[in-house]
């Protein structure tokens, strides 16, 4: 069973398109789309464990130029 998360991303003005393209290129990212509202990009990612997710996805996302804030929302089964 894999760990899945949605990551909501705020960007600098005019950077949502380039951030979306950069995020989409990261291994483990299953979808990323520009949106309107308080966040500019919403992406979904998955990895084998939370540790793998942190190393392979989250660290790379947070290093992308133009990102000002992220909010990570783990997917749960209720």
Model-found features: residue ranges?
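A compositional/biophysical signature of low hydrophobicity enriched in polar/charged and small residues
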Residues: 1-78
